[in-house]
Amino acid sequence: MSTPYTWDIFCRVVDNFGDAAVCWRLARQLALEHGDRVRLWIDDVSPLERLNPEISAAREAQEVDTVAIRRWTGPLDAAMPAQVVVEAFGGGLPEPYVAAMAAAAQRPLWLVLEYLSAEAWVPAHHGRPSPPPRVALERYYFFPGFVEGTGGLLRERELFARRDRFDDAASAALWRTLGHEPPGPGSTTVSVFSYESAPLRELLECWSGGPAPTVVALPEGRALPLALDYFGAGDPAPGRVLRRGALEVRVVPFMPQALYDELLWACDINFVRGEDSFVRAQWAARPFVWQAYPQPEGAHVAKLEAFMQAYSTGLPSGPRDAVWDMSRIWNQIAAPGVTPASAWRALQASQGLLRQHGAAWAERLASLGDLAGNLRCFWRRKVKNG
């Protein structure tokens, strides 16, 4: 194992599970795979409790998977800075902590971990210095990304091996763990993890009137009320099954991260949102549709289109148009002449080619290294170069 480093990761929760999920995944990988000593400072612990049942939102301080989790509520006057300080998603750092960083005998490296984007400007800004005002500290932007010259994506060392071992028996066991029997033969299985702004009702209508069974796994969360309203149902309890026509919606519990990976592997097509589930869908090497986090003035549209441009490169025109059209529909972007039903039919017809493409895409992304390892390399270079 390489030399252990010390890390402080600061996270303000904005996108509920997205920000917390990325920071927890990073902290956990640094600690478990690299043996680093990691503190995760987070202002709202409750999302972590949903992601890992060993974590308690009631505790101010706890240690899980060798990560020290601290509720970030006070000024942190007594906190001794780590060697590397990660400011997640521009959430800032406590002023007394910054002062302690500046006063340290060996000043820490301050990294601003930015949101994931495929936009063309990202490589030029990755690793760029951004000296903070009023204090003599080194601060750099660190961008996850999909190309050389970026920080890559979070990926655990054994992820692909776990994915490739996941077979029909494991899939059946997963469904039973989630409170349901395995879907029958001939069904298209779909997972949906979306914001409430997604046009889910239109897709439910399409699936219910389809020529073959569609089984939808819908976790507890922001999209579930849309489905309950469609069915006129009031009970959102996990284990419930809602049926209409060819459609079967299975309510599943909000699940730990490792179990969610298995759900992605068990489904034919995955609808994902934000950042963490978006990345996991790509590692799953299955067809997927991404709902970008909605931003003011449509800033998320540029992010979506930049990613789609990169992801769809090399696809034949049919599958390329299918994934573009479904992505626009799902993000409520104008797609003239395209309906949710027509977009879905085209996407479903392209499953085979999209699955092959997804496997090749995942391998290409893996060649960039992983985000945790690339962060450590960045720190080593800075230490070596003084």
Predicted regions mapped to residue ranges:
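C-terminal amphipathic helix plus adjacent low-complexity
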Residues: 313-386
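Hydrophobic/aromatic beta-strand patches that form the interior of the parallel beta-sheet core
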Residues: 39, 70, 86, 109-111, ...
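A donor-sugar binding/catalytic signature common to diverse glycosyltransferases
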Residues: 24-28, 254-303
